[in-house]
């Protein structure tokens, strides 16, 4: 009996050991499969990371190449002992002018099926070959307008000789025809002499220049579109002004100028000792009072159009100055020093911002140039 019990015990232990062995073998197989799957995932992850790394390196090389090209696209200007580095000749063919605007078709696909594109000229004698073109963009601000005050300040503080050697261009960047009519009427009534002499022009930008989304009614939800359209407004005005003068001065429709601002500006440009200044600031606010060589305007416009949806134009201007002078990965301190050499500042500022009602409906701004 005792032997029988021992045999049963051995049999039970054997069964238990067999079951445990089967369980262990099963778990080992599962673990092995999991390890194999894990290893496959790790290998797949490594391959993915390697592809991403290679792609990133390629993108980085391409980006550096593009930035390098942009950086050296605008050649340093040669020094000149005269205020006039080069007089721009009168345009002989309309085709020459139209080509200025063909660049828009590369960045704005909706224009690629259009024919010749050019702003509408509401008032103007097509003056060219002058030293300075002064550009002012304007849109309807509802019941608030500063344009007449701005034009009075800008034009009345020129000498007759300075007025003869310049052209002020007002660009109406508003699709409301009534606003265009009001601007034309005001200009013809208040500044008849300058209109007749060709010192003052008014152009209008047709709606077809803009992507349709930028023409939607302005709301707080699409405030970004207002900023985007503003960049295009400036670019179009720059393209129009580029063949007219040696220098281009950017103003806005809600500023006033200091007495003798034009004389001071002209004398300062002639006295700048830097051989390769990029642009000169006659105001520290935004895009107001920025002076460019007209021959450089196309390069600025190219850069602005590449990033016109990304940032306001004054920020893009700061970016291109950094790009112009700073090496990729170079020290920030030396970069900022080089930037100051190409972005020349004139103090005290020659222009002051006076508008409080923004061109964006319902928005107020109380920006002042403290160096004015």
Curated annotation (Swiss-Prot):
One GO location term (cellular component): Golgi stack
KW Membrane (keyword) present: yes
Carbohydrate-modified residues: 54, 143
Residue intervals annotated with topology Lumenal: 30-372
Cytoplasmic side of membrane: 1-8
PTM remark: N-glycosylated. O-glycosylated; further modified with terminal sialic acid residues.
InterPro entries the record matches: Glyco_transf_54
Subunit: May self-associate; specifically in the endoplasmic reticulum prior to its translocation to the Golgi. Interacts with MGAT1, MGAT3 and MAN2A2; may interact with MGTA1 specifically in the Golgi.
Family: Belongs to the glycosyltransferase 54 family.
Protein name: Alpha-1,3-mannosyl-glycoprotein 4-beta-N-acetylglucosaminyltransferase-like protein MGAT4D
Native species: Rattus norvegicus (Rat)
Gene: Mgat4d
